[in-house]
């Protein structure tokens, strides 16, 4: 059996399957003879050392781990340790995320401002850069597309419009995704996340489904998180769709999760340090901003929620 017991290698968890971890390792520069038959990367089916469970260390997709006792013939190994995370997205659970790309459909299903904002706030809460991917732009007019782009710009976000039917915007999206290490593709069901991955990485061929005509929203096809290589050492995570992300935040911090509010608060200060930007005198937040009613509604939910600092 071709097994390496003495050398520990680093790898990244690309999927969780039952009680196993799928770990990808890169050994192209390793000089040991046992690697001669391999080129580039290989995925190993791994179990974890029991000490990790005793220590209360959870392992999720995206975690950087140490693997040992590698059986190259059967592609199996043991995960012995996990490195500290640089970031963590709670839902979907992915570690070391550098970009959250939120897929929003221009049509079918219809755009939902509250839903979109909740996904953006999920990234903001985790202090991870968000990017909006506007899908299905072949279903709308050029004027409507301009309105979408201007809307997201007023919120403080970049937007890459794409269509898998005519490949519009695909090259720009690939270029952007290859500039970051690990991108999570998130968004509600039915917006075309899985179809987009199939278009970006044709060798993947993930199952897809159409939008329900009765419910007017998508159905879930992705059941678990998995990482896929998109070139230049970058990884892309497909995630299960869900339609109402929860917001967990201190009420006093909530306004700082909105880029358009942050801009105003950085230019001038409210009269009172504990201003929640409701009806306090001397508040500098423009109450006519598009997302201000959404902010107020969810702020009240946070304040009145029986659970600590949660809206949703």
Curated annotation (Swiss-Prot):
Similarity-based family: Belongs to the TRAFAC class YlqF/YawG GTPase family. RsgA subfamily.
Superkingdom of the organism of origin: Bacteria
Gene Ontology terms: biological process: ribosomal small subunit biogenesis
GO terms, molecular function: GTP binding; GTPase activity; metal ion binding; rRNA binding
InterPro entries for this protein: G_CP_dom (IPR030378), P-loop_NTPase (IPR027417), Ribosome_biogen_GTPase_RsgA (IPR004881), RsgA_GTPase_dom (IPR010914)
Cofactor info, note text: Binds 1 zinc ion per subunit.
Swiss-Prot/TrEMBL keywords: Cytoplasm, GTP-binding, Hydrolase, Metal-binding, Nucleotide-binding, Ribosome biogenesis, RNA-binding, rRNA-binding, Zinc
Ranges in a coiled coil: none
Function: One of several proteins that assist in the late maturation steps of the functional core of the 30S ribosomal subunit. Helps release RbfA from mature subunits. May play a role in the assembly of ribosomal proteins into the subunit. Circularly permuted GTPase that catalyzes slow GTP hydrolysis, GTPase activity is stimulated by the 30S ribosomal subunit.
HAMAP family: GTPase_RsgA
Residue positions binding Zn(2+): 270, 275, 277, 283
Main location: cytoplasm
Quaternary structure and partners: Monomer. Associates with 30S ribosomal subunit, binds 16S rRNA.
Binding residue positions for GTP: 135-138, 187-195
Any single Gene Ontology cellular-component annotation: cytoplasm
Domain CP-type G positions: 86-245
UniProt cross-references to CDD domains, sorted A to Z: YjeQ_EngC
Cofactor(s) needed for function: Zn(2+)
Subcellular location field: Cytoplasm
EC number: 3.6.1.-
Name of this chain's protein: Small ribosomal subunit biogenesis GTPase RsgA
Enzyme class: hydrolase
Species of origin: Prochlorococcus marinus (strain NATL1A)
Cytoplasm in keyword set: yes
